[in-house]
Amino acid sequence: MKNIVLGGGCFWCVEAVFERLKGVIDTEVGYSGGNPNPSYESVCNGDGNIEVVKINYDEKQISLLEILTLFFKIHDPTSIDKQGGDIGIQYRSIIFYENEEDKILAQNFIEEQQKIFSKKIVTKISRLQTYYKAENYHQHYFINNPNQGYCQAVIAPKLQKIQSD
């Protein structure tokens, strides 16, 4: 089993996509990259943390390259601190790696993707230093709240788009 931690906008959206994938064992939303011991309120108030999803996966069933490819399909890696209507540093695009092999793979992936994108890719690659699990009510949010307004307006269409691709 391996882990990768991704930030690409609202963590509810990112988790909703990855928790459905074959080979993904578990997902957990949290915060990384800012002040210690964050809360949702402190993150929304700009404490420097990023909304992220920790993805625990079986590399025999799904590769990191497949995960990163999907990650770049579900968010805009050329947008600085913004995804759709979600604006703020907590929504920046980032790949937190745990080992050098994953770092190199991510760097090579972005280099190849840049040949496809007309705008500059701003996704950062950084070693995971600290990770804080988000509050329980954020975990598996779409599964637990499928009829909530944001879920219907933003997450459900994203899932439909991915399924049709």
From Swiss-Prot:
<comment type="similarity">
    <text>Belongs to the MsrA Met sulfoxide reductase family.</text>
</comment>
<comment type="function">
    <text>Has an important function as a repair enzyme for proteins that have been inactivated by oxidation. Catalyzes the reversible oxidation-reduction of methionine sulfoxide in proteins to methionine.</text>
</comment>
<dbReference type="Pfam" id="PF01625">
    <property type="entry name" value="PMSR"/>
</dbReference>
<dbReference type="GO" id="GO:0033744">
    <property type="term" value="F:L-methionine:thioredoxin-disulfide S-oxidoreductase activity"/>
</dbReference>
<feature type="active site">
    <location>
        <position position="10"/>
    </location>
</feature>
<keyword id="KW-0560">Oxidoreductase</keyword>
<dbReference type="GO" id="GO:0008113">
    <property type="term" value="F:peptide-methionine (S)-S-oxide reductase activity"/>
</dbReference>
<dbReference type="InterPro" id="IPR002569">
    <property type="entry name" value="Met_Sox_Rdtase_MsrA_dom"/>
</dbReference>
<dbReference type="GO" id="GO:0036211">
    <property type="term" value="P:protein modification process"/>
</dbReference>
<dbReference type="InterPro" id="IPR036509">
    <property type="entry name" value="Met_Sox_Rdtase_MsrA_sf"/>
</dbReference>
<protein>
    <recommendedName>
        <fullName>Peptide methionine sulfoxide reductase MsrA</fullName>
        <ecNumber>1.8.4.11</ecNumber>
    </recommendedName>
</protein>
